[in-house]
Amino acid sequence: MMANILGAGVYSDIFFVAFKLPNLFRRIFAEGSFSQSFLPSFIRSSIKGSFASLVGLIFCIVLFMWCLLVALNPLWLAKLLAYGFDEETLKLCAPIVAINFWYLLLVFITTFLGALLQYKHSFFASAYSASLLNVCMILALLISKEKTHLEALYYLSYGVLLGGVAQILLHFYPLVKLGLLNLLWKGFLSFKTKNAAKKKYRSKRIKRDLKGFFKQFLPSVLGNSSAQIASFLDTTIASFLASGSVSYLYYANRVFQLPLALFAIAISTALFPSIAIALKNNQQDLILQRLQKAWFFLVGVLLLCSIGGIMLSKEITELLFERGQFSPKDTLITSQVFSLYLLGLLPFGLTKLFSLWLYAKLEQKKAAKISLISLFLGLAASLSLMPLLGVLGLALANSLSGLFLFVLTIKAFGFQLFLGIIKNLKSWLVILFLACVEILLLLAFKSWVTHLYLFYYFQGF
C-alpha cells in the first residue's frame, strides 16, 4: 500500500527517515531488550508495584521531554537523521519527524505494559499490538489515496500515532483483569506514605532494584540491537545517495526481517528461559543438546529462506510492491538490495541463538562489546563499499556486519563447544539434500513461468 501511493522517491524517503528512529526503538523493545532486563529485576523486587511504577515514570518523563524538544525544533534531528538531504527536502522532512517522534513515548508504554503481562504469562496483547499499527497506517493511506504526496505523509504520520494509542489501549483489559493496573496504582501511591520507617525501607529497596535494572538494561539494548542500529546508520548514509535509496533499503529490509522474526527471534525467545534454568542448575550437556537441535533447525530453515529469497527476489519484490508509484526500475533495485540483505540472514539469525548463552550467564557487557565491534566494522564496510556500489554496497556491508557479529559471538561462546554442536553429519546431509531439491524446483518453476509467459505473449493475450 505504501509503495503503491508513495513509490520509491523523495516523499517515501522523507517518511522512512522520519519513522526510522521510532521504528528502531519499536524493533529493539519488541525483540526483548527491555523485557530481558526489566523482568528479572521485577521478579526479584519485593516491592514490585513501586519498582514498576517508578521505572515506567522515569522512562515516560525522559521520553516526553525528548519528544517535546523535537516538537519545538525538529530541524536539527532531521539533519542528524538525513544529513545528505538538501535544504528544501529537510524543511519538508522536519515536521514529519516531529510528528513521528511522539511514537517513541507510545511504543515504550506499549512495551512496558507488555512486559508486565509477560510476568503473568499473558502474551495476547503483545502478539497482536503490532498489527494495530499496520491497520492504522493502512487506513491512513486509504484515506489519503486521492491527496498529494505531502498530504499523504501527514495522514500516514498521524496514522502512526493513532496506531500507538491503539496498541496501548489493547493492553488495558488484560492489565485490569490480572490486577496489574491496580498493582501499578498502589505502587505509585506508596511514594506518598508518611511513615518515615516505611519510606526509608522503600527508598533503600528501590535504589537497589533500579541500580540492578539499569546495570542490565543498557548493555542488553546494545547487545540485542546491532542489526537494527546498523540498518539505522545505513539510512543516514543512504540520504547522501540518489533519491529513492532510503526507500529501497526500507522495503528490502522489511521483507528480510520476516524470516528473521518468524524463526530466529521466535526460537531464541522461547529457548531463553530453559537455557537460563539449565545453566543455573549446571546442566551444560542439556544446554548443548538443545542448542544443537535449534542450530540445525535454524540452519536448515534460514538457508532455504535465503536460497528461495535470492532466486525469487525480483518476483517477490514485484508481487509485494510493484504497483502505482512503484516502478519496474524500483523493483529491480529493491530486489538486488533484498538479495544482498539475505546473505546476512544466516549469521544474524544464528547469532541470536548463541547470544542466549551470554545473556543466561548475565554477560550483557560482553554481548554489548561484541555488538559495538561489529557495528564499527560494519560502518567501515558501508563507507568503503558505498562509493563503489551505492545502495547495494550498504546492503552488502550490513550482511558483512552480521558475519562479524556471528564470528565474535562464537568466539565468546567457545570454539570447542561450537564444534561439538555442529558435529552431526546426518543433519548436514539432510540440509544439503533439501537445499539442492529447492534449487532444482525453483529453477524448474522459473523456467515453466518463463515459457508460459512467452506462450501467452506470442498468442496475443
Curated annotation (Swiss-Prot):
InterPro entries linked to this entry: MurJ
GO cellular component, one term: plasma membrane
Molecular function as annotated in GO: lipid-linked peptidoglycan transporter activity
Pathway(s) annotated for this protein in UniProt: Cell wall biogenesis; peptidoglycan biosynthesis
GO biological process terms on file: cell wall organization; peptidoglycan biosynthetic process; regulation of cell shape
Functional description taken from the UniProt entry: Involved in peptidoglycan biosynthesis. Transports lipid-linked peptidoglycan precursors from the inner to the outer leaflet of the cytoplasmic membrane.
PANTHER family recorded: LIPID II FLIPPASE MURJ-RELATED
Entry similarity comment: Belongs to the MurJ/MviN family.
Name this polypeptide is given: Probable lipid II flippase MurJ
